[in-house]
Amino acid sequence: PIPEPTAPFKALAARAHATFETYLPGAGLSRAATWIVQARMRWLSDFASQHVDPGPVTLCVTDAHPGNFVIRRDGRAVFVDLEKPAYNLPGLDLAHAVIAVAAGWDPTAGMQPAAAARDGFVKAWMAAVPAEIAERTAPLILAARQAVWLRTFGFFLRWRTESQADGPWSATRLGPGAAAHFRRHVEASLDDEAIRSAAEAWTA
């Protein structure tokens, strides 16, 4: 069955907390960077406990970075990686498509969208979806970006650790070019300056 969390932010916070509990202590982040991450996790837990309204819920793809879409000749974008579908908040998919840590993941389609490009994409998305979804998603856009950043950051911490060992996350299962790109992107995303920049973006 397709997952359908009754409290999407609370479910995301629980998964992120479990990941950070396992991988953050040995991540080698600076004290300042660790403090930022822990502060944002506290924010997410507090926000999730207050935001219990599940709507608007739609079928979401979860892993909505640019590399998981194919652009057809008629200009339509088709999602091609249906590994993690869930009935969830569409704003989480929207956030995953535009925040830098997620948008830069793919070796060929990865990008670092500037603020103008990000905002233009969000505006186009809001105009394309049903009005009720747009209206109910708008107040959650910034919160969704923060939540998805934490989810993705936790994934990167796990990938950096487990990609170095044998197993399903091993970098040896990837081509050398893809493995090198993922490693560069993960290390850049875990850099102090990248973490500080993300924290600044949360206020914009």
What are these regions (language model features)?
Residues A27, E132, T152-A204:
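ATP/Mg2+ or Mg2+-diphosphate-binding catalytic cores
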Residues E4, E132-V148:
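All-alpha amphipathic helical-bundle segments outside canonical DNA-binding/catalytic cores
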Residues L29, E83, P107-M111:
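A ubiquitous short alpha-helical element
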Residues W43-L92, V98, W105:
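Active-site acidic catalytic loop and adjacent metal/ATP-binding pocket
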Residues G91-E132, Q146-A165:
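Active-site activation/catalytic loop segments of kinase-like enzymes and analogous catalytic loops
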Residues I36-R40, P113-A117, F121, R145, ...:
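Soluble or luminal CAZymes and related metallo-dependent hydrolases
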Residues P1-R42, A48-L59, K84-L89, A165-R184:
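A cross-family kinase active-site recognition segment
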